[in-house]
Amino acid sequence: MKLSDFDFNVPNALIAQYPSSERDNSDLLIAGTKHIKTKFYNIIDYLKEGDLLVFNNSKVIKAKLHLGKNITINLNKKLSDNCWGAFAKPARKLNIGDEFYFDTHKIIITEKLAMGEIKVKFILNNISMIKFLDKYGEMPLPFYIKRTSSVCCSNMALFCDHDNTLKITSISHNSNTVNFRSTDSMIDSTNDNDRYQTIYSQIEGSVAAPTAGLHFTKDILDKLKTKGINTAFVTLHVGAGTFLPVKTENIHKHKMHTEYCSITAETAEIINKTKQKGRDIIAVGTTTLRTLESSCNNGIVKAGNFETDIFITPGFNFQIVDMLLTNFHFPKSTLFILICAFAGFKEMHALYKYAIKEKMRFFSYGDATLLYRKV
């Protein structure tokens, strides 16, 4: 199939810039011969006792850093204790050896790769990487969610968004060195630090949120337990590559970035027992689905830590997941291609057409849909 087969138009007005007033107050579209539009807090009505919801418990880190010169980097993947792969915008303004200072801490550009990808080295002064990012970084919101503005004046610039404020205190043009200091002024009116994180996130490492889980509240999790619906957790650290476009018309020539996954023995056991009993496995998000389908062999989920670059396209043989809870995805994206593989090409085009007609909210902060595997 061609990339153009997965194209459709989403009106800009439907791209959610902010989350719903409450996590579970977003809309939920149940796919079927007759689609059902309801509120997310009603999802329990569409699940059965003995079913298993599998969540991705990865936690989003503040992976976006301002380097000055109107340059930002989004960390993508940890390569070693102090080295990371990242995406720079615009990368053309960076040179190997450039140094950027955040108070007494330093970032060095060590390598430039294709498509804006770079490698950086962190030299930190008595601070952990996570604490450094908590202090100087920002939530890595997707590019289509608009928050940041900048005001530049001679050799000083102020970067401000609704979560955090960073100030460049000096720029040394000769040495390509930029000095930063953090400020105590935190602007959090949109609450992105909270709402771009699932309530059950535990293991730090994602640079984009597994957004299907953003709708869940403690109340919903409690009600699932009361109804006898089981839960389990896997880990997939979402990389910045999740936002990279497919650039080949032949979709099978697209290469996915690798992402770290982990499945505990306890989780593997409960999934396999659920399958043996003939109950449904519901993946909360495409990251969970990709983790489960990457880990299985002959219908059995294997525990362990591994990396996956799985790209699921129509014709894929799903072995584990029966239902998929996910948000609405970009046209011509790997994730829209995935749901077409899972729930049917014609069916997903029709579902999205219906969602647009109903003015449902799209993408990371948007509404959710519950899909059934096409058999």
Curated annotation (Swiss-Prot):
GO terms for molecular function: S-adenosylmethionine:tRNA ribosyltransferase-isomerase activity. Keywords: Cytoplasm, Queuosine biosynthesis, S-adenosyl-L-methionine, Transferase. Coiled coil: none annotated. Pathway: tRNA modification; tRNA-queuosine biosynthesis. It catalyses: 7-aminomethyl-7-carbaguanosine(34) in tRNA + S-adenosyl-L-methionine = epoxyqueuosine(34) in tRNA + adenine + L-methionine + 2 H(+). Transmembrane segments: none annotated. It is an enzyme of class 2 (transferase). InterPro entries: QueA, QueA_dom1, QueA_dom2, QueA_sf. Pfam families: Queuosine_synth. It is found in: Cytoplasm. The keyword Cytoplasm applies. GO terms for cellular component: cytoplasm. Its EC number is 2.4.99.17. Monomer. Belongs to the QueA family. Transfers and isomerizes the ribose moiety from AdoMet to the 7-aminomethyl group of 7-deazaguanine (preQ1-tRNA) to give epoxyqueuosine (oQ-tRNA). NCBIfam families: PRK01424.1. This is S-adenosylmethionine:tRNA ribosyltransferase-isomerase. It comes from Rickettsia typhi (strain ATCC VR-144 / Wilmington). The lineage of its organism: Bacteria, Pseudomonadati, Pseudomonadota, Alphaproteobacteria, Rickettsiales. The gene is queA.
